[in-house]
């Protein structure tokens, strides 16, 4: 179809949304004026400014644009919504570098405590949740937003549902990250690991996440392809389960609607159980199911091979969905949690090893007949190595959930090494590979600016990961053995400070590994930036000649 005429009038939806954000800005100004503490006043003022900026953007977009609602097709081609994907891709790299940098800082603080600088906002206690949230939710979350919006459009051959809704999701999510992150630095926290944001940030995330679910679901419902590709099943499981986890773990009663402090509804062992039901399944569905969707789409696309076994991918999906949700109690071994609950969590954790390795095998065997591409394509190599790290982490996790093993590993640096094998090796590498694929596609470039830089990124980051996790494995096992060592008289052989001193060289090695990983991400950011800036545009083929997505 031909391009529509220019429309400068606001739609009913745009008018309503602009009015809603104008009212929100007014209420936030009142909240800032009546705030009981400085952090709440800052966040209320920040929200007022952001709301007014949204109103301005809605009004501004009405000028010099095609018809009020974008056409579903232009000249016979699906008119895909790429703006939100570009925004999330950019924010993923921004938050990734920020999160890796903060991680390097806190790793250095453990090796050299003077780097805390005796300032509250530079202390380890405030920077650590900033690091985890920036890497997991800001970097990882934006990668998932960008890839899910791309994959669901391409595999369904239809534009994203809604006009402003996808933009609300990506902008609203990143504003939530900004509120949560600045809150940590100001001392605003629920003190629940991976669920630190206070009540008003949680409310914002709830609204954004429900909108995300609706956009994704409606896009699938109006698809033009009869089959729902398996990656969309994994994305949908991730979105739905994170919503349930967020609502279950974060009910809280604010001390005042004009203050940042709240009290969580649960207490005691119930709170601990809810927390690690949430914490473990945040790993299981945010850091596993969502990124498995990336694996199932991007590895076949990059390798130009079909998924090794589509049937195995369906078995992998349902087994993972059923088993993962029950495994949380293994985080609470040797605590006040009832013993039968600990054993149940351990049992499901061990069972989880089988579907996890089924998915790993499916991802690796997709390269059947294309293994030679690993020599020439560093992006594919990065994606495949991420699957190997996934297999390693999903073997180590069930092993560490066994009570006998956990009696040594619990509370030690071994757990830190395990987490980062998954976070850096699996999540990091599959995210990097996805962005290396996605940016040229979305910005319509023939390829990346430099494959040689991708190769440098791969080897530098791999060396960083090996240094990091090896140091933490050795440190953790040494730590556990020193804690449980007794003299012939039955006294502890080592004082606590002696165990801390023994960790010092390993903490230096960890910081070095983290520094290398950060350098790799900076190389990637430069490569992607140059791809967008100077990359050669790709000539689009007619729809009839395009390969199926």
Where are the regions a protein language model picked out?
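Membrane-interfacial, low-structure loops and terminal tails that flank and connect transmembrane helices
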Residues: 1-9, 65-86, 370-373, 445-448, ...
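Hydrophobic cores of alpha-helical transmembrane segments in multi-pass integral membrane proteins
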Residues: 11-67, 86-188, 199-220, 232-257, ...
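Fe-S ferredoxin-like electron-transfer domains
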Residues: 72, 197-200
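Helix-boundary and loop/linker segments of multi-pass membrane transporters
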Residues: 126-128, 266, 372-375, 414
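Membrane-interface helix termini and inter-helical loops of multi-pass transporters
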Residues: 190-193, 335-338, 406-410
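Surface-exposed loop and adjacent secondary-structure segments within mature catalytic domains
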Residues: 196-197, 259-267
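Extended, leucine-rich alpha-helical cores of fungal transcription factors
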Residues: 227-228
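Active-site-proximal inter-transmembrane loops
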Residues: 264-272, 409, 414-416
